[in-house]
Amino acid sequence: VTYLDELRDVIRRLHGVESTHVESVPIKETFQGKTVWEGIVEVFDLKNHPKAARIYAWAYERDNAKKPRHVTVLHMGPVTSPLLAVRAAIVQEYRNAEAES
């Protein structure tokens, strides 16, 4: 199973639709001069999704390298680019961490 196939499977499982890979976009997000996220965001077109025609997806390693964390962000509302998808995911993770503490 390739990385893109893995992401397609995650999209299918989470959103219930098929997807087609469009492009890979390198993103480097910095905050106060420090890199807070750097990686490749995969862009997919969605087939028959009720709210969005496109989705951004990526994975990153956590403590267990065999179980990466997969992230998907729908192209809707304020999220209109791979960079904005990364920013939205960072904000969401921060909020989740705040809620847990």
Segments and roles (model prediction):
Residues 20-84:
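Acidic, low-complexity, intrinsically disordered interaction modules
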